[in-house]
């Protein structure tokens, strides 16, 4: 199979030329593939193309995406979780999060995850494989088609560790920006932090994309190394001090602030002394803290921080001069919230 999803307009012009067609036929394919209001789901539906050209493309194995919708779950707040099957019969999940003026797509970069964070459902069954860029982009098509709305924002916060699939990640970002017409500034890449990869991400972004304007979000979740190691096993390989050093360098290179994701776990990392410790750790450079209320999952005994305590924690950070917000959880009643995505439909 030759997936056209992810092809640039120039790529598709070349496809047309290779089959004896005029270049504008490639531009027609491009429009029918990426234009939300004029999108087709298969080559057969592009009726502006000559029939013989459509038949040639199908005979040569060209397709418009390769994921298959298996299940969908609509939460009370309008959040939609989709369970998609790959051609090798693996499963991946993505989430559409609507608000009044935008639609955020939460995308997966891998089938499963190797990081085994103790508070997250995704890593419970380990990593199966990384996704191809076309499989990442296909998630956007499904969200737009199912929600009948154009995606305006992208967060790589679904299944998997994006920086362990960096080539396909950056190819996806290029297409999201240029083909799906979503500004890099509306794209967020979330990582638990992999040694040497934060620096590599900024370097490769300039090489592949020509710029680095997306938001880097670090899944920090602790104010010190000891606590972080207890909830994120991979933290043993990358000291929290060096993560912050690399983030400072990222800001210098890109001019973009770094976001720190901080999942509040009652009795683990949510005391005011942790807020002070976190403030001292990250002060002095352009950053923002996203406090996240824990979403309960099976097999895990962590408890959600009471709202009153979370507000006190937020106030302490703010009083310490840290830009901070308390993120409202979406879709938790359908296991579509942060930390609840997994490879199968066992939990519904």
Swiss-Prot record:
Residues of the active site: 93, 338
PROSITE patterns the record matches: RADICAL_SAM
GO cellular component: cytoplasm
Pfam families registered for this protein in UniProt: Radical_SAM (PF04055), RlmN_N (PF21016)
Residues that, per the record, bind S-adenosyl-L-methionine: 160-161, 190, 219-221, 295
Enzyme class name: transferase
HAMAP family reported in the protein's UniProt record: RNA_methyltr_RlmN
Family: Belongs to the radical SAM superfamily. RlmN family.
Protein name: Probable dual-specificity RNA methyltransferase RlmN
Gene: rlmN
């Amino acid at each position: 199979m030759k997936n056209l999803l992810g092809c640039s307009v120039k790529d598709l012009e070349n496809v047309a030329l290779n089959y004896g067609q005029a270049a504008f036929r490639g531009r027609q394919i491009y429009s029918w593939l990426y234009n939300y209001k004029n999108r087709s789901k298969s080559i057969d539906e592009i009726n502006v193309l000559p029939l013989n050209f459509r038949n040639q493309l199908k005979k040569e194995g060209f397709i418009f995406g390769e994921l298959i919708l298996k299940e969908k779950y609509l939460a009370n707040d309008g959040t939609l979780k989709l369970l998609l099957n790959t051609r090798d019969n693996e499963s991946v999940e993505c989430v559409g999060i609507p608000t009044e003026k935008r639609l955020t797509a939460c995308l997966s970069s891998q089938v499963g995850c190797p990081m085994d964070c103790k508070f997250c459902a995704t890593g419970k069954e380990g990593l199966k494989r990384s996704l191809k860029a076309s499989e990442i982009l296909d998630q956007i098509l499904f969200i737009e088609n199912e929600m009948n709305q154009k995606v305006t924002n992208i967060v790589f916060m679904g299944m998997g560790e994006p920086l362990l699939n960096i080539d396909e990640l950056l190819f996806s970002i290029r297409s999201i920006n240029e083909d799906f017409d979503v500004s890099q500034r509306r794209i967020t890449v979330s990582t638990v932090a992999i040694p040497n990869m934060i620096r590599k991400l900024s370097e490769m972004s300039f090489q592949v994309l020509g710029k680095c304007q997306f938001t880097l979000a670090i899944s920090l979740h602790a104010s010190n190394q000891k606590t972080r190691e207890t909830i994120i096993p991979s933290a043993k390989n990358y000291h929290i001090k060096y993560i912050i050093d690399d983030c400072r360098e990222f800001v210098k290179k890109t001019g973009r602030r770094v976001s720190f994701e901080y999942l509040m776990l009652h009795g683990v990392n949510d005391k005011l002394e942790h807020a002070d410790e976190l403030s001292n750790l990250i002060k002095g450079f352009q950053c923002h803290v996203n406090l996240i209320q824990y979403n309960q999952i099976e097999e895990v005994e962590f408890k959600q921080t009471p709202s009153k305590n979370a507000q006190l924690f937020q106030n302490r950070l703010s009083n310490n001069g840290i830009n901070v917000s308390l993120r409202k959880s979406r879709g938790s009643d359908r296991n579509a919230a942060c930390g609840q995505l997994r490879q199968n439909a066992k939990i519904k």
